[in-house]
A protein has these predicted regions:
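Catalytic cores of alpha/beta
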Residues: 27, 68-78, 111-119, 155-170
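C-terminal helical cap(s) of enzyme catalytic domains, especially alpha/beta-barrels
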Residues: 95-101, 180-203
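Catalytic beta/alpha-barrel core
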Residues: 15-17, 37-45, 59-67, 80-88, ...
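Glycine-rich phosphate-binding active-site loops on the catalytic face of alpha/beta enzymes
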Residues: 82, 87-92, 126-134, 167-190
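Core segments of cupin and vicinal oxygen chelate
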Residues: 44-46, 210-248, 277, 288-296
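Vicinal oxygen chelate
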Residues: 246-250, 276-314
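Conserved, mostly hydrophobic/aromatic
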Residues: 14, 31, 75, 124, ...
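N-terminal beta-strand motif that seeds the catalytic metal site of vicinal oxygen chelate
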Residues: 3-16, 198-223, 256-263
Length: 314
């Protein structure tokens, strides 16, 4: 998987405030058990270079706050999978390009983004400014609709979705999942926080239940019964009648022995990635995509309790 795509599908990049090479392997195990496999540490933090060298075998490890080409060379030699430079530095960008490693320069203004785009970059880093962060990001996205943004600081699991909900955002560096290098007894807590963050990012919720019928007339009658009894307004939506938004009555035998269940997610690409990590299989012939190429809907390969299950974009 290409690095930018890996960042996008993970969504969450765990920020390591105090890197410790001795804890790299247990940290990687704890994070991966929670569904996360990308980390970022500031390269000027004590022990950062050794941590990246130790963790790059297990995780996609990024080096942040790179200020000089020399620092970039050290980070790349240590095994950094991506670089976040402190500004738009053409020499750092060139060094990374030679190694086929993404360079994501920190961009604070439209002029910064323009300079990065002029150097051929399609993704940059953006550090939010408190509560004004989402508005500032929206302004940059309006000026540069083809640019993608890595959110690089000041984000927690409680605030990340304000950014991850934006289609231009690759991922967020999220603080608080790992506050310090985890000792052995902290591994379970790291895994728990990672799982909680993933579920918060995906924001799964039941969207509707699907009922299979043999034909349009039966579907009409079935949806009509729900309208009559419960006041769920019937609506013909082409391939199915809906009773409100809760019940989809198919006009033919469709997926699922008993019907289907739709589970909505904030981002279907990220949901599919996490579910595959958990062992789920997908029927990719059922996949539908948004005009921009993002996954919109896809069915699981296996039924659950006799129901087909599909993941649907919120």
């Amino acid at each position: 998987m290409k690095t930018l795509q890996q960042l996008y599908k993970n969504g969450i990049v765990v920020f390591i405030q105090t890197p410790n090479a001795a804890q790299a392997a247990p940290l990687a195990q704890a994070l991966q058990a929670g569904g996360l496999s990308c980390v970022l540490t500031s390269f000027d933090a004590p022990g950062a270079e050794a941590f990246i060298r130790a963790s790059s075998s297990f995780l996609l490890a990024g080096a942040g706050n790179i200020r000089t080409p020399q620092e970039a060379q050290h980070a790349l030699k240590a095994g950094a999978g991506f670089i976040i430079s402190a500004d738009v530095n053409p020499e750092i960008i060139r060094l990374c390009a030679e190694k086929n490693i993404p360079a994501l320069p920190e961009c604070r203004t439209s002029a910064d983004v323009q300079a990065a785009a002029g150097l051929g970059l399609t993704a940059v880093s953006f550090s939010p400014d408190g509560a004004n962060g989402p508005a500032a990001l929206n302004a940059l996205c309006a000026d540069f609709p083809d640019m993608r943004f890595f959110i690089s600081g000041g984000v927690t699991a409680d605030t990340m979705n304000a950014y991850l909900s934006h289609k231009a955002v690759l991922a967020c560096a999220v603080e608080g999942i790992v506050n310090n290098p985890p000792a052995e007894q902290d591994a379970a807590a790291v895994t728990r926080r990672a799982k909680e963050a993933v579920l918060k990012m995906l924001a799964f919720e039941l969207r509707h239940v699907g009922i299979n019928t043999p034909d349009a007339q039966t579907a009409d009658e079935t949806a009509g019964a729900f309208e009559k009894l419960f006041g769920f307004k019937k609506e013909d939506r082409g391939g199915a009648y809906f009773a409100a938004d809760y019940i989809e009555v198919m006009k033919k035998q469709f997926y699922g022995t008993h019907g289907h269940i739709a589970v909505a997610a904030a981002n279907v690409d990220r949901a599919a990635y996490q579910l595959e990590r958990a062992g789920a299989r997908f029927n990719w012939d059922s996949a539908g995509y948004n005009p921009d190429g993002r996954l919109r809907v896809v069915y699981l390969q296996d039924e659950i309790g006799g129901f087909a299950v599909h993941i649907l974009q919120k």
